[in-house]
């Protein structure tokens, strides 16, 4: 009985910890319209978070759209499958990931990135900024 309780407690603790990470699948929500825009998968490798667009969810979205305004290796790449988050790393002692970039495929611009899981990891505050000017979207966890 004690072993069962211990296993359940450890499993619950692991689940709670795992949710306070940006890693997972998220619905990006337009901060201006409240509309669900896309499904984004965030992964972590070598301590850095990356994110790709897995599904375009906006009504009437062009599933064959390309990032014509992007630069470098993302120039003219399909938006579906496009890596829009690169290089965010966890800040020591905090549930915050910074130091990376987020791409807005609608204008091809990269912004300084901050990711902050909130509400027990059910939501993710995604802040993109240039200098002191920026905006925050709240994404909703899918899985």
Give a label for each model feature.
Residues 19-25, 93-100, 122-125:
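Short, hydrophobic/aromatic-rich segments at coil-to-beta transitions
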Residues 121, 130-143:
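Edge beta-strand at a domain terminus
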Residues 4-13:
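Sec-dependent N-terminal signal peptides
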Residues 14-18:
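Sec/Tat signal peptide C-region and signal peptidase I cleavage site
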Residues 52, 125-127:
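Beta-strand residues in well-ordered beta-sheet regions across diverse protein folds
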Residues 28-113:
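Central antiparallel beta-sheet cores of small beta-barrel/beta-sandwich binding domains
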Residues 45, 118-120:
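Structural motif
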């Amino acid at each position: 009985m004690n072993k069962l309780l211990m296993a359940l407690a450890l499993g619950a603790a692991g689940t709670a910890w795992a949710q306070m990470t940006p890693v997972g699948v998220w619905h990006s929500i337009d901060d201006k319209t409240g509309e669900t825009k896309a499904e984004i998968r965030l992964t972590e490798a070598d301590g850095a978070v990356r994110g790709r667009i897995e599904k375009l969810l906006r009504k009437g979205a062009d599933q064959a759209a390309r990032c014509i305004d992007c630069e470098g290796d993302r120039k003219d790449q399909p938006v579906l499958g496009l890596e829009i988050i690169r290089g965010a790393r966890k800040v020591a002692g905090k549930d915050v990931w910074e130091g990376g970039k987020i791409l807005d495929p609608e204008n091809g611009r990269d912004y300084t990135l901050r990711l902050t899981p909130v509400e027990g990891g059910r939501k993710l505050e995604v802040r993109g900024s240039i200098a002191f000017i920026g905006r925050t979207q709240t994404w909703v966890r899918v899985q």
